Curated annotation (Swiss-Prot):
Residue positions with a glycan: N69, N185, N331
Cofactor info, note text: Binds 1 zinc ion per subunit.
Active site: E146
Main subcellular localisation: secreted
Positions of the Disintegrin domain: 215-301
Cofactor: Zn(2+)
Disulfide cysteine pairs (residue numbers): C120-C202, C164-C186, C166-C169, C218-C247, C229-C242, C231-C237, C241-C264, C255-C261, C260-C286, C273-C293, C280-C312, C305-C317, C324-C374, C339-C385, C352-C362, C369-C411, C405-C417
Subunit organization: Monomer.
Binding positions (Ca(2+) 2): V217, N220, L222, E224, E227, D230
Sequence positions that bind Ca(2+) 3: D281, E284, D296
Protein source organism: Gloydius brevicauda (Korean slamosa snake)
Name recorded for this polypeptide: Zinc metalloproteinase-disintegrin-like brevilysin H2a
Cellular component per GO, a single term: extracellular region
Binding site for Zn(2+): H145, H149, H155
Length: 424
């Protein structure tokens, strides 16, 4: 748990500057870009104390017209920006969070707004920020504050039960000229709770050099184009393989970090660098030619797993018993065959396939690839065939793809029970 909490995190940030920002900078896009690069450099500095690096991986400037309606109503603007990000931006460019920078003044004293504990979520990992000051640092601290909300942090309130021992930290409820670059204990606790509760996966992945669109800065701990390594400032760098002042490897070093870097040299070929997580995963070993561990590889689809209870499918071992337990708890088991006969009817929620409004009943041989049936506890003479469904998600409560439906057979994407050797 402590190792999970202490791991370095990387927020891959996309920033969108709207039309009002272009007007504010008199159409000088180079000047506007510089302004934004400075903002991101400051945000990265602020977050390094939490072992988080913030990298700008995408910058979009709406120089002709805004792609959403940016208004003084912050709540509405945030909602439309979140929707646009999910339906448009994410399809074009991979990133962890997107923030809008605008010169439109929001209602009241609001200078920014973001969804709380939303990092890595498709529709809510967003924030909006008003470019409210001539002082770059103050705008940067506003965006750092809104990003803090995405990472699960609430405002620092100074009251008796929640003494945050900081009136001017990043998550202070209102911005002031006294604001500091520090996080309060409350913010640190909020962030750790967010990591524990939500387990956001996307921020564990380090951006590659070529993903970062801002000019390289030696000493910001991010490995960028033109750098061989970056271990922070010469004062703080602890890495003997890297020359902090130049971001070049020290004499005789092959590497400065990586799962396959051992004392500044590439690990020997064959050294295991990532253990197999389970029987549908494969262990990876170093090549001897690189500091990086090869890409995480999975067992082939159809390989038997969990003592032949199932077959591997995309790195998982889907079996009906585990699906029942996930729906109904630990005393659930798979229902007897008689329950699965409901899937032969093709009525209501009992079927193998549904295309638009047309329902296709299961053939006898495919009945265990339709709706999943479970029972709770020991069954007497009367069997209660438990099943579940959702109006929003047609696959919810169905037997998972790749699940073993008979010996040597699995459910394919058409929900047919087919030979495991020809299914994939």
């Amino acid at each position: 748990q402590q190792r999970y909490l202490n791991a370095k995190r990387y927020v891959k940030l996309a920033i969108v500057a709207d039309r009002s920002m272009v007007t504010k900078h008199n159409g000088k896009l180079k000047k506007l870009r510089k302004w934004i690069y400075r903002i991101v450099n400051t945000i990265n500095e602020v977050y390094r104390s939490l072992n988080i690096l913030v990298a700008l991986v995408y910058l979009e400037i709406w120089s002709k017209e805004d792609l959403i309606n940016v208004t003084s109503a912050a709540k509405d603007t945030l909602a439309s920006f979140g929707n646009w990000r999910a339906t448009d931006l994410l399809k074009r460019r991979s990133h962890d969070a997107a923030h809008l920078l605008t010169n439109i003044k929001f209602d009241g004293t609001t200078v920014g707004k973001a969804y709380v504990a939303s990092m890595c979520q498709q529709d809510s990992s967003v924030g909006i920020n008003q470019d409210h000051s001539k002082i770059n640092l103050l705008v940067a601290l506003t965006m750092a504050h809104e990003l803090g909300h995405n990472l699960g942090m609430s405002h620092d309130v100074v009251n008796t039960e929640k003494q945050c021992n900081c009136g001017t930290c990043v998550m202070a409820p209102t911005i002031s000229d006294q604001i500091s670059k520090l996080f309060s204990n409350c913010s640190k606790n909020d962030y750790e709770n967010f990591l524990t509760l939500y387990k956001p996966q996307c921020i564990l992945n380090e951006p590659s050099k070529t993903d970062i669109v801002s000019p390289p800065v030696c000493g910001n701990e991010l490995l960028e184009v033109g750098e061989e390594c970056d271990c922070g400032s010469p004062e703080t760098c602890q890495n003997p393989c890297c020359d902090a002042a130049t971001c070049k490897l020290t004499s005789g070093s092959q590497c400065a970090k990586g799962l396959c870097c051992d004392q500044c040299k590439f690990s020997k070929s064959g050294t295991e660098c990532r253990a197999a997580k389970d029987d549908c995963d494969i262990a990876e070993s170093c090549t001897g030619q690189s500091a990086d561990c090869p890409t995480d590889d999975l067992q082939r689809n159809g390989k038997p797993c969990q003592n032949n209870a199932g077959y591997c499918y995309n790195g998982k071992c889907p079996i009906m018993l585990n699906q029942c337990i996930s729906f109904y708890g630990s005393n659930a088991t798979v229902a007897p065959d008689i329950c699965f006969n409901y899937n032969l009817k093709g009525e209501g929620n009992f079927y193998c396939r549904k295309e638009q409004a047309t329902i296709f009943p299961c053939a006898q041989k495919d009945k265990k690839c339709g709706r999943l049936f479970c029972v709770l506890g020991p069954t007497g003479k009367r069997i209660s065939c438990k099943n579940t469904y959702s109006e929003d998600d047609p696959n919810y409560g169905m037997v998972d793809l790749g699940t073993k439906c008979e010996d040597g057979k699995v459910c394919n994407s058409n929900r047919e029970c087919v030979d495991v050797n020809t299914a994939y």
